[in-house]
Amino acid sequence: MTLIHMNIIMAFSMSLVGLLMYRSHLMSALLCLEGMMLSLFVLAALTILNSHFTLANMMPIILLVFAACEAAIGLALLVTISNTYGTDYVQNLNLLQC
């Protein structure tokens, strides 16, 4: 495993730890998810370039499309939650709350 791969895996792990630690606010959770998706994109692109697997060239682009959709839905949810409740706490997403 090269140093580049280890750095990308460490970036993914740090984003995952950030998601687990700072999950009280929706904005910080969205930023950590974006970091995870970006590191997965770079890892997929490097893996495809190193293995010369031409059939999977579109996989990183598809991953970026899903990341953009996730970001758009997350930001729309953030705007809705902050307009409704006035805060961006993740605990406001619980539908069973009275």
From Swiss-Prot:
It is a multi-pass membrane protein. The gene is MT-ND4L. GO terms for molecular function: NADH dehydrogenase (ubiquinone) activity. It is found in: Mitochondrion inner membrane. The keyword Transferase does not apply. InterPro entries: NADH_UbQ_OxRdtase_chain4L/K, NUOK/Mnh_C1-like. Core subunit of the mitochondrial membrane respiratory chain NADH dehydrogenase (Complex I) which catalyzes electron transfer from NADH through the respiratory chain, using ubiquinone as an electron acceptor. Part of the enzyme membrane arm which is embedded in the lipid bilayer and involved in proton translocation. It catalyses: a ubiquinone + NADH + 5 H(+)(in) = a ubiquinol + NAD(+) + 4 H(+)(out). Keywords: Electron transport, Membrane, Mitochondrion, Mitochondrion inner membrane, NAD, Respiratory chain, Translocase, Transmembrane, Transmembrane helix, Transport, Ubiquinone. It is an enzyme of class 7 (translocase). This is NADH-ubiquinone oxidoreductase chain 4L. Pfam families: Oxidored_q2 (PF00420). Its EC number is 7.1.1.2. GO terms for cellular component: mitochondrial inner membrane; respiratory chain complex I.
